[in-house]
Swiss-Prot record:
Residues 330-867 are mitochondrial intermembrane. Residues 203-293 form the RRM domain. Residues 797-857 form a coiled coil. It is found in: Mitochondrion inner membrane. Residues 42-308 are mitochondrial matrix. One of its GO terms (cellular component) is mitochondrial inner membrane. Residues 614-639 have a biased composition (Basic and acidic residues). GO terms for molecular function: RNA binding. The gene is msp-45. Residues 48-59 have a biased composition (Low complexity). Residues 1-20, 44-66, 614-647 are annotated as: Disordered. Residues 1-41 form a transit peptide. This is Mitochondrial escape protein 2.
Length: 867
């Protein structure tokens, strides 16, 4: 930073013995500053700040060398606290120099705050100090100024400093920017370095010990010596010597001052100071510079040194922030999903448009479906009324609707039981369980309940962070969450939103407005939302934890009177997981079976009566006359009157429905085939053929690894063949367990086949009693497969081969035991002879059975060759 040369003014009043000035220009400038002896125009044109030195070279010497030259009987004083310390950092990129800045001060209307005037006041107001000021050099960066002065030969510079400091102590001069501070003066004992580098003052001083002469070695000063030298400038907090094992040269020490102003005074007064310690031959020069103090950062150091505490704490804070910010948003979206805020079909505009156009636009397909379902729901009206009545009661238990797939569970509950309910949450477990990966599962579950925003991808990133933290610190940060915890979080947020939904219709004018929220929900079961959990226990062996958490969540909802819960499942073992979540409770179970032949026939007829192809004259053919077409056109005019069906068609339906059974999905397929012009007999036959083909592909000719299935192809064929040959369309459960084909894990195999819906296990008094086909059409498909000679021969060969393999293994075990007993026969024949005879008889019987199996295999192979 380039320093300006400042002229101090001289007092002009008579008898004044203040500082004197050495040049004529000095007097002129003093007169100018006092406003005397010069005309106004001259006062305006005279430069404000000029050097009092007579030599131009000496004037700019410190600008080039960075040092101030002094003559004999000439010394330097440093005045502190004249400028704000931050001024230099603010003006670091200023386009003007220090001289320009000081000229702006004087020429402006704010010249009364000129910092150089403080120096003049400190010097000129005290006639006790007989000095002559020759030069004033401001230091904006250090917040002070150097004053060069001459003193009488009989008075030392130290005495001048002492008197001046005493006067400033008794008559303090306070700067305008710091009314609580005061100007201080110190004698410059060294050689100050006037640099203009960007080195801002600090409270820490680095003192380097260098040799006063090039050929000498410096001495390292002790802390006591440094304290005695620098204590006069201000309070010192710490003196740190260089470590003894350090090889850094030159040797140094750190001195920490309490105030930055004290460090500035010490640096400007003692830089270049030369001293000689007692007993030392060589002199040591002190070279001072500001040093950035490394802050302790105790809090950060504690955090980094205690990762076992800090990392879980940070994770907890992040979780708390997430809950505070995102949970209210997610609860809002769940409420909107349940109450259907954003669905267009729930808007007033759509409802008005639908009411205005319902008599004009005919939605034929929907009308056809409604006709068939209405016939079905009329048959099940008692079940519908029973479930609706249960939703009006305050009973803390589940409602479970069980039935085989395709029995109409979802349509019964959503389209009939909950038709008039507005607050219904439908959760389909099938897409949740079938989703790929944890992120997909969480995303699907969040979609089902309306939980958003959801950052399912963030858990993968959190897992990587956990891995990185654990590998570096050895502590698991627990930023990531497992699948179970994420499912619980979504369900808890959903429960909170459902409670708000149940309380949304509560008003202050109600008679029971003084009740608590829980008491209100208990007293008004009709206000609670209804949760329908569809496809419960679908593929439960893959992601059973999801079903466990859903069951626990549903149990908490019904026990807290927050919502009614209805489970829809086709798994007969639904009671096990539900009993774990809600023990000591009796569930409201509703079982939907296959329709009886009469109801099934009515269902198909109701589907067909809405289609004009099945009018009184029979099925239309390509050769029908135009008169019949006109009759059909006349019948279309009255769409509300069911069209009578052809009697021939009705007779065929009686026999075909008996073979097809009463499964709702199969009846719908039959109705669609009849609508496209197929006869009932042909439609049923094609359904049976398609079903048999599916069974053959999925259970008998499947190329999937046997390790992925809990049953074998031979076991599936055993059940198919025996059910096809059974007059009652069923086989005893225990007879299957005792068969050789099911010798290994029979119950596991039967359970797997039941879950695959190939068979149905009927129970009596809680115990499995008989086995039937998975659905009625399967029985006809089994008979078709068993009557196919090629399929039967191939499957029988597999069964015989497996049985022969089992007999061979039994014989090999007997042979191994006989070899072991051979040594004992020679020593103690009486003890082992009975066992040997038993094994020989067993081996004989096994060999006979093996021979018979091989004979049967030969016959089957012959049939396959002929076929």
């Amino acid at each position: 930073m380039i320093s300006a040369h400042i002229l101090s003014r001289q007092a002009t009043r008579p008898g004044h013995r203040g500082p004197r000035f050495t040049t004529h220009s000095t007097a002129l400038l003093v007169q100018r500053s006092l406003g005397q002896g010069l005309p106004l125009a001259h006062r305006r044109t005279t430069r404000a700040w000029e050097s009092t030195s007579s030599s131009t070279a000496s004037t700019g010497s410190h600008k080039e060398s960075g040092h101030i030259e002094t003559a004999p009987h000439e010394s330097l004083l440093f005045f502190n606290n004249l400028f704000p310390l931050k001024l230099s950092s603010i003006l670091i990129w200023r386009p003007w120099t220090s001289e320009d800045l000081l000229q702006r001060f004087e020429q402006s209307s704010y010249s009364f705050i000129d910092p150089i005037r403080l120096v003049k006041r400190a010097i000129n107001t005290h006639d006790q100090v007989p000095i002559e000021v020759t030069q004033i050099i401001p230091r904006l960066k250090d917040g002070g100024a150097f004053v060069k002065f001459t003193h009488p030969s009989d008075m030392s510079a130290a005495v001048v400093e002492s008197k001046l400091s005493e006067l400033l102590q008794n008559n303090p001069i306070k700067p305008w920017f710091n009314p609580f501070g005061r100007v201080k003066a110190g004698l410059v004992e060294g050689v100050p370095w006037l640099e203009d580098l960007y080195r801002l003052p600090r409270s820490r001083i680095r003192v380097e010990f260098v040799a006063a002469k090039d050929d000498a070695s410096p001495a390292e000063l002790s802390q006591e010596t440094l304290y005695s030298i620098f204590r006069k400038f201000g309070k010192i907090t710490e003196i740190t010597s260089q470590p003894t094992d350090s090889k850094v040269l030159p040797r140094f020490a750190y001195i920490d001052f309490v105030l930055v102003r004290d460090a500035i005074m010490a640096r400007n007064c003692m830089h270049g100071f030369v001293l000689r310690e007692q007993g030392s031959k060589n002199a040591t020069k002190l070279r001072l510079s500001y040093e950035q103090r490394v802050k302790a950062h105790h809090i950060w150091a504690w955090f980094t040194s205690h990762p076992r505490i800090v990392i879980p704490l940070v994770a907890a804070l992040i979780a708390a922030f997430t809950v505070a910010v995102f949970d209210p948003i997610r609860e809002f979206f769940v409420k909107a999903h349940v109450q259907k805020y954003f669905e267009f079909t729930n808007s007033r505009l759509y409802k008005w448009f639908k009411s205005q156009t319902s008599d004009i636009l005919a939605f034929r397909r929907r009308k056809t479906e409604d006709a068939g379902l209405n016939a079905l729901f009329t048959h099940r009206k008692d079940l519908i009324d029973s479930i609706q009545t249960g939703l009006l009661e305050s009973v803390d238990t589940f409602t479970v609707v069980h039935g085989p797939r395709g029995s109409g569970k979802k349509e019964l509950i959503l389209d009939q039981v909950l038709k008039e309910r507005s607050n219904v949450l439908h959760i389909d477990c099938k897409p949740v369980v079938e989703a790929r990966g944890e992120a997909g599962t969480i995303g699907r579950l969040a979609f089902e309940v309306g939980y958003r925003p959801v950052f399912s991808w963030s858990n993968n990133i959190s897992s990587l962070v956990d891995l990185a933290v654990q590998s570096t610190t050895g502590v698991k940060a627990n930023f990531s969450e497992n699948l179970e915890s994420q499912v619980v979080k979504i369900l808890q947020t959903t429960a909170s939103a459902l409670k708000q939904v149940g309380l949304s219709e509560r008003k202050k004018e109600d008679k029971d407005a003084d009740l608590s929220e829980d008491a209100y929900l208990e007293a008004h079961p009709e206000r609670r939302p209804v949760i329908v959990i569809d496809h419960f226990l679908h593929k439960s062996e893959e992601k059973g934890v999801i079903y466990d958490r859903i069951a626990d969540w549903a149990a908490a909802l019904v026990q807290s009177n927050i919502a009614h819960v209805i489970f829809l499942t086709d798994d007969a073992s639904y009671s096990k997981p539900l009993q774990r979540s809600l023990p000591d409770r009796v569930f409201r179970s509703v079982t939907l079976g296959d329709l009886s032949p009469d109801v099934a026939k009515k269902f198909v007829i109701s589907q067909l009566q809405t289609d004009t192809k099945f009018a009184h004259d029979g099925q239309q053919k390509d050769s029908e006359s135009g008169d019949q077409d006109n009759d059909n056109k006349n019948q279309k005019k009255d769409s509300n009157t069911p069209a009578p069906l052809d009697p021939t068609l009705l007779k065929e339906l009686d026999t075909c429905i008996t073979a097809l059974g009463g499964r709702l999905t199969d009846l719908q397929v039959l109705a669609r085939r009849l609508k496209i012009g197929q006869s009932p007999r042909k439609a049923v036959q094609e359904i049976i053929d398609s079903t048999a083909s599916d069974i053959l592909r999925m259970f008998l000719l499947s190329k999937s690894s046997t390790s992925d299935r809990k049953y074998t192809t031979e076991q599936a064929w055993y059940l198919i063949s025996h059910l096809a040959a059974s007059p009652s369309s069923s086989i005893p459960y225990n007879s299957v367990l005792l068969s050789n084909t099911f010798a290994s894990s029979p119950e596991t195999a039967l359970e797997a086949l039941a879950n695959a819906e190939l068979i149905t296990v009927k129970s009596q008094n809680g115990m499995p009693s008989e086995i039937k086909a998975g659905k009625p059409v399967y029985q006809a498909a089994f008979q078709k497969l068993a009557s196919d000679e090629k399929v039967k021969a191939r499957m029988d060969l597999l069964v015989l081969t497996e049985l022969a393999k089992m007999e061979t293994q039994k014989i090999e075990k007997v042979e191994q035991e006989l070899v072991m007993l051979q040594g004992l026969m020679a020593r103690r024949p009486g003890d082992v002879s009975e066992r040997v005879e038993y094994l020989l008889e067993k081996m004989k019987g096994g060999q006979a059975r093996l021979k018979g199996l091989e004979k049967e295999m030969g016959v089957v192979k012959g049939q396959m060759v002929k076929g």
